[in-house]
Amino acid sequence: MERVRGACQSPILILLAIVLPFPSTSGPAIHPLIESLAARIRQRRAQLPELSPFALDSVMESISGQLDGEELLISNELHRCRGMRKLHLEIARLGGGLQVLHCVFFPDPRFDLPIFGADIVAGPAGISAAIVDLSPVGLTMPEALLHGLESLPIPAFQQVRELPEWGSIFSPFVQFIRPASSQEESWFVDLADGYLKALISSVIDATPDASDAASTIQRHKSQLSYCIQQKRNDKTRGVLEKAFNPQWADRYIEEILFEDPPPL
């Protein structure tokens, strides 16, 4: 197994992901790994209880801009369900090169549930990064969910990447890799699917604590810390500022990518 060093181009952050068709056909097709994981996420998302759309300003649904002379296309799909306050799936494409899938499921702090996150970064040379995790916001991972994750077989990925400096927000189950083959890409989708199935089972069985319970307050604090840590990624902000403007970038990061949990 090779551990790959280098700048983290997008572990659970950099650009965004899209669930709508891109309006441009000038570039290459969406990478098969991005298509496969997006399809699997949508399939599992549909199994969540009381699923409904998340209110989204229409100007944030489908976005286009210019970055270094290339067209940047972004689209977003957001939902909510019982137990999860925000389910976000995006795909972005820059010209005929960079493609990014970004997905985060944020739990309602009243429920003892983790944050699901997955990112894929693809370029002309293939996949440079793929990451998936269930990050606990409680003091520990719920026991039933922990057992489910421990039972999942972890594929023997050849190139395991190092986490960024702010990687303390991730769990011991985080997988951050550079797939070395189409077989490893398939393994990654199946692994992410295993994480999603474990999460969905926990969501279905979960019951809420009171809003003023110590456990809820602690989870709210931890989720707020997660969002703050994610917002510290200057690369994400720099790309958005260059393609649009600083005010728009701030709004996108604060309202779409890593919106703080609402006050209890």
UniProtKB/Swiss-Prot annotation:
GO terms for molecular function: cobalt ion binding; phycocyanobilin:ferredoxin oxidoreductase activity. It catalyses: (2R,3Z)-phycocyanobilin + 4 oxidized [2Fe-2S]-[ferredoxin] = biliverdin IXalpha + 4 reduced [2Fe-2S]-[ferredoxin] + 4 H(+). Keywords: Oxidoreductase. Belongs to the HY2 family. It is an enzyme of class 1 (oxidoreductase). Pfam families: Fe_bilin_red (PF05996). The keyword Oxidoreductase applies. This is Phycocyanobilin:ferredoxin oxidoreductase. The keyword Oxidoreductase applies. The lineage of its organism: Bacteria, Bacillati, Cyanobacteriota, Cyanophyceae, Synechococcales. Its EC number is 1.3.7.5. It comes from the Bacteria. Catalyzes the four-electron reduction of biliverdin IX-alpha (2-electron reduction at both the A and D rings); the reaction proceeds via an isolatable 2-electron intermediate, 181,182-dihydrobiliverdin. PANTHER family: PHYTOCHROMOBILIN:FERREDOXIN OXIDOREDUCTASE, CHLOROPLASTIC. GO terms for biological process: phytochromobilin biosynthetic process. InterPro entries: Ferredoxin-dep_bilin_Rdtase, Ferredoxin_bilin_OxRdtase. HAMAP family: Ferredoxin_bilin_red (MF_00618). It comes from Prochlorococcus marinus (strain MIT 9313).
